[in-house]
Amino acid sequence: MNQQLNTTRKSTAARGRMGLVGGILLVIGTCIGAGIFFKSERVLQNMGGNTTLALLVWLMAGITVILMGLALVEITAKAAFDDLALLSWTQKFTNNTFYKACKRFLIWIYLPTTFFFMPLYLVQSLQDGLRGFGVANHFNTPHDWAIWMVIVLLINLWFFFTSGLSVKWTSVQNVVLLLLKVIPLIAVVILALWLGASAEQMERQPVVPVKDFTAISPFFGWFSAMGAIFFAFDGFYVSAAAKTQLKKQKNYRK
């Protein structure tokens, strides 16, 4: 009887998990952060308006992100302690004091701020998109901030509750969000090439000097820009634990 019950539980758990394709899409959707849409202008400002330095920063940061992803693939493919991703690695490779400090930081600071700022970035993207198409991005009331805050809270509550319903439902939501992030990325490249080809017909805007500590010299701006780019891909640490939700995990260990 107990053996039959255990078999039923295992089969139910397996059905609740995602397949390999769903896992790949989850990792891609998590790693492509919405922050990348806000960082290009900031990176250029940190470089003092120097396009060449900005391109070098993006190139170096992109290579670093790829290498970091490959390193995490090696860790998660061969380690049996990745259920909690970063926390599991901290517990395994560091002392107990550092592990507890990391755990408290993630629980009390990182997760609450992430749950707040990610929907806020989504709302900012929506506002920028509406403004770009000439559509009003406000409600024309003196309390617009409160309305947007309610929208952010509703988005938080929606993902907080629906993500825990089932892995399948989470995968569907991830595919939708992935499309919403990938389509603008492709569209931006196409628009940039098209606008670049007709640059002679565009009115050039003067470069306004940035009065910021990070823009005093390219040295400070370089590190500030690196941090801004890395923030857009910080989903690596979360997505590394996705393997625990895959079906037939042993087939994907190597």
Swiss-Prot record:
Principal subcellular localisation of the protein: membrane
Transmembrane domains' residue ranges: 18-38, 53-73, 105-125, 145-165, 175-195, 213-233
GO cellular component, one term: plasma membrane
Pfam families: AA_permease_2
Single Gene Ontology MF annotation: transmembrane transporter activity
Topology in membrane: Multi-pass membrane protein
Subcellular location: Cell membrane
Keyword Membrane: yes
Family affiliation: To M.pneumoniae MPN_308 N-terminal region.
Xref: PANTHER family: AMINO ACID TRANSPORTER-RELATED, MEMBRANE PROTEIN
Protein name per UniProt: Uncharacterized protein MPN_095
Record organism: Mycoplasma pneumoniae (strain ATCC 29342 / M129 / Subtype 1)
